[in-house]
């Protein structure tokens, strides 16, 4: 099966956000950010748990005030996933959430303040053994850089990032990652390319303020896909004006499409035409809904007719090819004697997929124990 990614990852140093390794060949971490009021502890904890359920490796939480910092303390004690505290303007909030157990501090060079304030944050992070993310954003560059470049440019984002990389280097602090996000795909991609050539720290990828569910997913897939295909990127966030849970799903779908990292089922399904022998679209939609809980990486092909069905089934863990009245069923590319009535496909195929996923998960567990 042709399932190995040809991508060679950019060499980078290793840091840890909580227990999640970032960089140096570690799996690319998928993260999201809460959109609740942080002071609403119950709502924020519920959202973080929902994100964790769909596979979030890391969750970022905005901490705009000291009241939010106090809420962060309770939130941190209530969840398992590592939390990044998102800090703007007031460096003292970073010091407070570090005391409260933040797993990473995100600071924005455009508004965090002078070098002395950054020094205070760095020394606190060093003392607590937690990393920092230098988070540059095209919408909040330093005033002197906007005066110099007139508008956000790759060079402006790069210069902003390097100013703070240099500060951390002078302070002999290497536990950090960097992002240079922009809402324009080409601006973000060019900025990350400049940064990737200059430093070895892990890079956090994102197209900021990408838009709603559909347009934002497409924009993120294009921009992040360009970078990931070049081996650039160690962690990512899909920024959508949508339920944060969808950000995690889209993030994994992007990684899955590049064969970088897989989680759950990769559905291969035809768009359907008049040759389809069953309703492909409703079948796929219902199976996706029912099987969201499966985390085992596997390929399932659902094709409505015999034109492409057998070929896709050949390279799938489970395959279904539409036939007259009954559809052919494949396991590991081998056609089985069993066939599905076309009006009973969903229940039957769900059972087969769940059994296959369980078997594959057990096989992986046994392999892990013997290695």
UniProtKB/Swiss-Prot annotation:
Protein name: 4-hydroxy-3-methylbut-2-en-1-yl diphosphate synthase (flavodoxin)
Cofactor binding note of this UniProt entry: Binds 1 [4Fe-4S] cluster.
Cofactor: [4Fe-4S] cluster
GO biological process, alphabetically ordered: isopentenyl diphosphate biosynthetic process, methylerythritol 4-phosphate pathway; terpenoid biosynthetic process
SUPFAM superfamilies linked to this entry: Dihydropteroate synthetase-like (SSF51717), Nitrite and sulphite reductase 4Fe-4S domain-like (SSF56014)
Gene field: ispG
InterPro entries (alphabetical): Dihydropteroate_synth-like_sf, IspG_bac, IspG_bac-typ, NO2/SO3_Rdtase_4Fe4S_sf
Catalytic activity: (2E)-4-hydroxy-3-methylbut-2-enyl diphosphate + oxidized [flavodoxin] + H2O + 2 H(+) = 2-C-methyl-D-erythritol 2,4-cyclic diphosphate + reduced [flavodoxin]
Family statement: Belongs to the IspG family.
Keyword Cell wall biogenesis/degradation: no
The UniProt record lists the keyword Ligase: no
GO MF annotation terms: 4 iron, 4 sulfur cluster binding; 4-hydroxy-3-methylbut-2-en-1-yl diphosphate synthase activity (ferredoxin); 4-hydroxy-3-methylbut-2-enyl-diphosphate synthase activity (flavodoxin); iron ion binding
Enzyme Commission code: 1.17.7.3
Function recorded in the entry: Converts 2C-methyl-D-erythritol 2,4-cyclodiphosphate (ME-2,4cPP) into 1-hydroxy-2-methyl-2-(E)-butenyl 4-diphosphate.
Residues holding [4Fe-4S] cluster: 270, 273, 305, 312
Pathway: Isoprenoid biosynthesis; isopentenyl diphosphate biosynthesis via DXP pathway; isopentenyl diphosphate from 1-deoxy-D-xylulose 5-phosphate: step 5/6
Protein keywords: 4Fe-4S, Iron, Iron-sulfur, Isoprene biosynthesis, Metal-binding, Oxidoreductase
Classification via Pfam families: GcpE (PF04551)
SS bond partners: none
NCBIfam families: ispG_gcpE (TIGR00612), PRK00366.1 (NF001540)
């Amino acid at each position: 099966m042709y399932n190995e990614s040809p991508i060679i990852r950019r060499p980078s140093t290793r840091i840890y956000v909580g227990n999640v390794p970032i960089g140096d060949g570690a799996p690319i971490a998928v993260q999201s950010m809460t959109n609740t009021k942080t002071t609403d502890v119950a709502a924020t904890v519920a959202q973080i748990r929902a994100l964790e359920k769909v596979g979030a490796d890391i969750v970022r939480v905005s901490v705009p005030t000291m009241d939010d910092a106090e809420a962060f303390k309770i939130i941190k004690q209530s969840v398992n996933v590592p939390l990044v505290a998102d800090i703007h303007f007031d460096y003292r909030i970073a010091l407070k959430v570090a005391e409260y157990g933040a797993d990473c501090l995100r600071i924005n060079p455009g508004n965090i303040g002078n070098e002395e304030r950054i020094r205070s944050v760095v020394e606190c992070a060093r003392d607590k053994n937690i990393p920092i993310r230098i988070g540059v954003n095209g919408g909040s560059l330093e005033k002197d850089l906007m005066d110099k470049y007139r508008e956000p440019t790759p060079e402006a984002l790069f210069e902003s990032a390097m100013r703070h990389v240099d500060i951390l280097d002078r302070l002999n602090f290497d536990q950090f990652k960097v992002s240079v996000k922009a809402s324009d795909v080409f601006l973000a991609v060019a900025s990350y390319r400049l940064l990737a050539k200059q430093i070895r720290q892990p890079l956090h990828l994102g197209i900021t303020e990408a838009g709603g569910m559909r347009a934002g997913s497409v924009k993120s897939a294009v921009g992040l896909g360009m970078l990931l295909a070049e081996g650039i990127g160690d962690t990512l966030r899909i920024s959508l004006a949508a339920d944060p849970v969808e950000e995690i799903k889209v993030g994994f779908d992007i990684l899955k499409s590049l064969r970088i990292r897989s989680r759950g089922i990769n559905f291969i399904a035809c768009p359907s035409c008049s040759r389809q022998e069953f309703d492909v679209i409703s079948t796929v939609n219902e199976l996706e809904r029912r099987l969201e809980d499966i985390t085992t990486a596997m390929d399932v092909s659902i094709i409505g007719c015999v034109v492409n069905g057998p070929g896709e089934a050949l390279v799938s863990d489970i395959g279904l090819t539409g036939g007259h009245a009954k559809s052919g069923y494949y396991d590991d590319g081998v056609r089985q004697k069993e066939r599905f009535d076309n009006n009973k496909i969903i229940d039957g195929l769900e059972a087969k997929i769940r059994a296959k996923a369980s078997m594959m998960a057990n096989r992986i567990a046994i392999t892990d124990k013997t290695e």
